[in-house]
Every structure is written in structure tokens, then in C-alpha cells.
């Protein structure tokens, strides 16, 4: 079973990603992880932190000479701003005099839309700092690090690549054209908003500029595409084994994500059954389809079509023109605390959604095919693909 977790706070010394259950022999380097972390910092509308934030990647365990060893993998991402926060975020007790600085003032005015309020009440904190430090989307950098290993496994074992693009930002008209292919990823990353379509890009930029002028923030929708998946990852046998339920849970677990859909998702509910599904036809190598409304999943299993997962991100909760709240110490009306933030982080969210999709797909592949090494997993995959090909119905010549 592939398992992952992260540790660390937004302004702590470092973030740490742990990945357990990865087979031996998967090629991975610190440079590859750094490249994915750089993609996470992309996007028009990001705040000042992205300009000076540097992700210092250190492989702590589980990798030797560029290959995974089969044991737990630990990856550290250092915080270049740690010296500014060393007293405030020190794990050990510090002299109270050292804490007499502005950035350590108690944060008692929770931000609507954030974890501050519920976290303070649940854990008994009189300050939102312990909540916001862990709840921060900075934590996703560690997920991206772990997900880079999963991406490498999918590429080497199955020839599968995962990409994302932004569908819409704010009220911009959603892109509704064909899904991009992996060969389009470089052009997508070159777009200021990671859009596949130039006309959509211009509308998104206009939305961000308007929000910036108004002292506001924006959310949006991203789509992740994974092509080349074999038929049969996941299962129909129980809800927890359905791949769509696993994908939805993983993506919904990303900070600020408020909705997930597979394929055409909610739009499918508006259609009649006769035009909602992907009809099948005999082809030279088995079943073929002319549509992919299901997004590559039927009955909780991959069906050989490209996987399409969309995620809706809410507007960033830290609004420059602070929202109304209540001071948790005095009980009086107040305006929410304002931490340094972005106007829009939707382009970066796409990279994080890619990460979670890659981790779930890698787990599903390892559950299906097993193996202790990449070579063994590949052999198991080849055997399965041969068996599936034999079961495919042969196309009949029309009379």
C-alpha cells in the first residue's frame, strides 16, 4: 500500500514529505522535485512571497544515486525565511523577551473562510498562529515533492503523464474545448494563468486585474488529465475501492478546494441518458468510443479513456480589504487579521491537483500490479495487458 504524509508549518524550519510503499528502481532526483516545486509557484496574481520563496530540496532517505530503494522516502523542503521566524516558531521554549516582536503578536481575529475559528475552539488555542501555520497552503509544497516520485513511477511503469490546465478564473467564461495532451504542457506552463486557450487566458487575466484593483481575491476551476491508463485500475466491489471516490477524497483534501467532478460531472446531471454516456463501437484493437463524458472512469474503474478530474478552488480567504469577524479575546466586532497572500492561486492549484491525482493513481497501480522493484511491476503490467488484449472483442467485418 502506497502511503504518504507531510509534516511542518508554513513558517517553520522546513516541510517534510514521507512516502512509503514505493518500489525500488524508480529514477528520481532533487532537480526533478525542484522543477515541480517551481511550477507550483507559477501564476499571474501570486503574492510577494513567490518572488523570494526558494524551495531547498534535500533527499533525507529512500533514494540512492537517483533511484528509489524500496524503503520509506523522506524529502525535506527548507524554508529560506526561517531566520526571520526562528523565535516565533521555535519548537523549544524561548525567552519571552525574544517574542516581543510584531510578528508574534497574538492573532485573535479569525479570518472567515479559514481554519482559524474552528481550529482555535477545537484545540483550545487563544491565538490563531498554531492553526494557520499548519492549515496554510504552503504545506502543499511537501505534497508536490512526494507526488513527483509518484509521477516518475507512473511514467516509468505505465508511460502515463499527468498534466493540468486552468478552465476558468472568477467569472471568466469556462474553457470548453478539447482536453490538452502532455505535449501541450510546456505551452500551458508558459501561460501566465496556465491556460490552454489564448482567448480564455486573456479573460482570466482581466478578471485578476479587476480583483487586484478592488482589493479582492479570486478562485477558479482547474482540470487534470492523465492519458495512457490501462483498463481496470480501481474496483466496483466497494465504495472505498472505487477510484473516483479515492480521487475525490484526495483532491478535496487540498486547501481551498470546494468541489470535484470526474469527466463532465455536474453537467452530466443536466442531460438525458441517451446523450450522457459514451457509446462503444468495435475497433481494430477492441472497443472504441467517440466521446469521453465519463472522464475515463466507469463503475469506479479506469476504462482506457483519458482520466479527467476537475477541481473548484474558492477565492483566497485572506482578503486585502479585511472581512468582518469577532475578536476571540474581547468578543467585540473586528476586522480579520491580514497575512501576506495572493490575489489568485488557481494556476498553482492545478499543479497540486496533478500531484494528488498522481499519488492516487500510483497507489492504485501498485495495488493492482504489485512488485518490489520497477522491473517486477513492469513485468506484471505487461502480463495483465496481454490478458486484457485477449479478452477484447475482435472487430467483425461489416457485410
Swiss-Prot record:
Give the GO molecular function terms.
chorismate synthase activity; FMN binding
**Cofactor(s) the record lists:** FMNH2
Q: Which domain of life is it from?
A: Bacteria
Tell me the keywords, alphabetical order. Amino-acid biosynthesis, Aromatic amino acid biosynthesis, FAD, Flavoprotein, FMN, Lyase, NADP
Name of a matching Pfam family: Chorismate_synt
Q: Which SUPFAM superfamilies match?
A: Chorismate synthase, AroC
Kindly give the InterPro entries that the UniProt entry links to this protein: Chorismate_synth (IPR000453), Chorismate_synth_AroC_sf (IPR035904), Chorismate_synthase_CS (IPR020541)
Protein's name according to its UniProt entry: Chorismate synthase
Class of this enzyme = lyase
A GO biological process held by the record: amino acid biosynthetic process
Report the HAMAP family cross-referenced here. Answer: Chorismate_synth
Read off the lineage from the record.
Bacteria, Bacillati, Actinomycetota, Actinomycetes, Mycobacteriales
Q: What is its EC number?
A: 4.2.3.5
- Could you name the Gene Ontology cellular component terms for this entry? cytosol
**Protein's UniProt keywords contain Lyase:** yes
How does this protein assemble? Answer: Homotetramer.
Catalysed reaction equations from the record = 5-O-(1-carboxyvinyl)-3-phosphoshikimate = chorismate + phosphate
Q: Which organism is it from?
A: Mycolicibacterium smegmatis (strain ATCC 700084 / mc(2)155) (Mycobacterium smegmatis)
| Gene name as annotated | aroC
Amino acid at each position: 500500500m502506497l502511503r504518504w504524509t507531510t509534516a511542518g508549518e508554513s513558517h517553520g524550519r522546513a516541510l517534510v514529505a514521507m512516502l512509503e510503499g514505493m518500489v525500488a528502481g524508480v529514477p528520481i532526483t532533487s532537480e526533478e522535485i525542484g522543477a515541480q516545486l517551481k511550477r507550483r509557484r507559477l501564476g499571474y496574481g501570486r503574492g510577494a512571497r513567490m518572488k523570494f520563496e526558494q524551495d531547498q530540496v534535500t533527499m533525507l532517505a529512500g533514494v540512492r544515486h537517483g533511484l528509489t530503494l524500496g524503503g520509506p522516502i523522506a524529502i525535506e523542503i527548507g524554508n529560506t525565511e526561517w531566520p526571520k521566524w526562528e523565535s516565533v516558531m521555535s519548537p523549544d521554549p524561548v525567552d519571552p523577551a525574544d517574542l516581543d516582536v510584531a510578528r508574534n503578536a497574538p492573532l485573535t481575529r479569525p479570518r472567515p473562510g479559514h481554519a482559524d475559528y474552528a481550529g482555535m475552539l477545537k484545540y483550545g488555542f487563544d491565538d490563531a498562529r498554531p492553526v494557520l501555520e499548519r492549515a496554510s497552503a504552503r504545506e502543499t509544497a511537501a505534497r508536490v515533492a512526494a507526488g513527483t516520485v509518484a509521477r516518475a513511477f507512473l511514467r516509468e511503469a505505465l508511460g502515463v503523464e499527468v498534466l493540468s490546465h486552468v478552465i476558468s478564473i472568477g467569472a471568466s467564461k469556462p474553457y470548453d474545448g478539447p482536453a490538452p495532451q502532455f505535449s501541450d504542457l510546456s505551452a500551458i506552463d508558459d501561460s501566465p494563468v496556465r491556460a490552454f486557450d489564448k482567448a480564455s487566458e486573456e479573460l482570466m487575466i482581466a478578471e485578476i486585474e479587476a480583483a487586484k484593483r478592488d482589493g479582492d481575491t479570486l478562485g477558479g476551476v482547474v482540470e487534470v488529465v492523465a492519458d495512457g491508463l490501462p483498463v481496470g485500475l480501481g474496483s466496483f466491489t466497494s465504495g472505498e475501492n472505487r477510484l473516483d471516490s479515492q480521487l475525490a477524497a484526495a483532491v478535496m483534501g487540498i486547501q481551498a478546494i470546494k468541489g470535484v467532478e470526474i469527466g463532465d460531472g455536474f453537467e452530466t446531471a443536466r442531460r438525458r441518458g441517451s446523450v450522457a454516456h459514451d457509446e462503444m463501437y468495435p475497433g481494430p484493437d477492441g472497443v472504441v468510443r467517440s466521446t469521453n463524458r465519463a472522464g475515463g472512469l466507469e463503475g469506479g474503474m479506469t476504462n482506457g479513456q483519458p482520466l479527467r478530474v476537475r477541481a473548484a478552488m474558492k477565492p483566497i480567504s485572506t482578503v486585502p480589504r479585511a472581512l468582518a469577524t469577532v475578536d476571540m479575546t474581547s468578543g467585540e466586532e473586528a476586522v480579520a487579521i491580514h497575512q501576506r497572500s495572493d490575489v489568485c492561486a488557481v494556476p498553482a492549484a492545478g499543479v497540486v491537483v496533478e500531484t494528488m491525482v498522481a499519488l492516487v493513481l500510483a497507489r492504485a497501480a501498485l495495488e493492482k500490479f504489485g512488485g518490489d522493484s520497477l522491473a517486477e511491476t513492469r513485468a506484471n503490467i505487461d502480463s495483465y495487458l496481454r490478458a486484457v488484449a485477449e479478452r477484447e472483442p475482435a472487430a467483425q467485418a461489416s457485410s
